[in-house]
Amino acid sequence: MRPCWPASAKIRCVSARELDAAGITDPVTRESNERCRRLNADHGKTYYLATLLLPPAKRPYVHALYGFARYADEIVDDLASSLSEQQKADWLGRWGDSVLADIAVGHSDDPIGRALVDTVNRWQIPVEHFEAFLHSMRMDLTVTEYATFDDLYTYVYGSAAVIGLQMVPILEPLDDAAYPAAVDLGVAFQLANFTRDVGEDLDRGRVYLPLEDLQRFGLTRAHLETRQVTDAVRD
């Protein structure tokens, strides 16, 4: 076999082998999957490296899920965007509704949606997981803080828990105990992200730490906005 080099060519060869292993033969769908893979590699480096631990036949489908989530998240969170919150909401609504409609009919011409629809069809992933995700993305455009953990959980379920639920059919676990475990893992990752990204979230005008939990430590949103790491913040 001819060696694949330089590096960019080698990556394309690896991607082609993964698509072959996954049984994805349609050229347009392969291009859509490759677009999703590049999104994963460029924007989710740790997630991308994690996919390399999976069998090659699984990787394109995971990239498709990432591509969908990343595209929606970029509409909402691109700090360089000149769009208003309402314009973002309109764009997300149109794109999300279009992808959901494509899932319903089993075909998409969207550059990201085509790989997603193929993945959903092959693995019979429930559409409500994607509806919940889009709902949480819309919340990011209107909700800037959460009074209680119960309030926050609605957002966390849609933005993180359902990602695990989307993954389970692809991973083909031995029993259904994987489903609640996937939810718990997604929630845990998201809560860790909230703790890590307080400053970044403030830049976007949001606080994900529940206000009732801040109050238990004598803190308010205003304390976080000072960007000072006090003993109370550490606690």
Residue map of PLM features:
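Acidic catalytic motifs of isoprenoid enzymes
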Residues: C4-D235
